[in-house]
Design a protein with these regions (language model features):
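Electrostatic, structured charged patches in enzyme active sites and in nucleic-acid/phosphate-binding
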Residues: 1-244
Length: 244
């Protein structure tokens, strides 16, 4: 993935200023960074319907991957820290994300920029205890502990790029009632009986094309239709099909 074409390089647009409700989260996120000079990302998930403040680029790329993943039911990008009892001591631990899949399994994820080298001998016990605490906390959620690094997201370069495009439409239309537009999209696809180009679909439905696009992307998140978000850059020529 080149620096020029990476999702981070493409994220140049300015979003809305954070509301007073988010200021506390922003200040807390600044504190969480400690001495690490990582980026802060104020994001809105149209899928979950809430804002989050993410404390690093890896967390942001992870969000772009999960926001439109058809296999995911829901996710929490800022789970509360937990206290687990381990070897007769209380240990505080936390995850960067908890992801629930449609097939019922759960992943409690820790996100790192890159793989860490083996700990020094004096740190090995601490690292082992921390990993054990993560495993215990994950079992509380009925899930498994998963560690991911930025390189894990490279195969999803197109999905992340397309997520940025789709999120701009969803953010612009988040206060619009799109139920009737979604119904019109579904009716048009049923009548067609075959995949329809995105721009042709918008023309058939009528009204504001940007709202039709937003309705299509909402339906994608709900698995009510399909788009080739992992295999090509989405444009007006992209084919919208029935759900798989």
């Amino acid at each position: 993935m080149s620096a020029e074409s990476s999702p981070l390089a493409l994220a140049k647009g300015r979003g809305p200023a954070p509301s007073s409700k988010l200021r506390k989260a922003v200040f807390e996120a600044c504190g969480q960074r400690a001495e690490h000079a990582s980026n802060l990302w104020l994001i809105y998930s149209a899928r979950i319907g809430r804002n989050w403040v993410l404390t690093g680029d890896t967390e942001y790329l992870h969000f772009l991957c999960v926001e439109f993943d058809p296999e995911i039911e829901s996710f929490d990008l800022k789970p509360q820290p937990e206290i687990v009892r381990l070897r007769e001591e209380d240990r505080k631990t936390s995850f960067d994300a908890i992801v629930r899949f449609r097939d019922g399994h759960i992943e409690c994820r820790e996100l790192k920029r890159e793989s860490e080298p083996p700990p020094e001998p004096e740190e090995q016990l601490r690292a082992a205890l921390q990993a054990e605490a993560q495993e215990i906390a994950a079992k509380r959620h009925g899930g498994r502990y998963v560690r991911m690094v930025m390189a894990d997201f490279e195969p999803f370069h197109l999905r992340m790029q397309n997520s940025l495009r789709m999120l701009r439409f969803l953010l612009a239309a988040k206060d619009e009632p799109l139920g009737e537009v979604r119904n019109a999209v579904a009716l048009t696809l049923r009548r067609s009986g075959a995949p329809v180009r995105l721009d042709a679909l918008a023309a058939s439905v009528g009204g504001v094309a940007a709202f039709v696009y937003a309705a299509v992307f909402q339906m994608l998140q709900r698995r009510q239709l399909s788009l080739p978000m992992d295999t090509e850059v989405l444009t007006g020529n992209s084919l919208v099909g029935s759900s798989k």
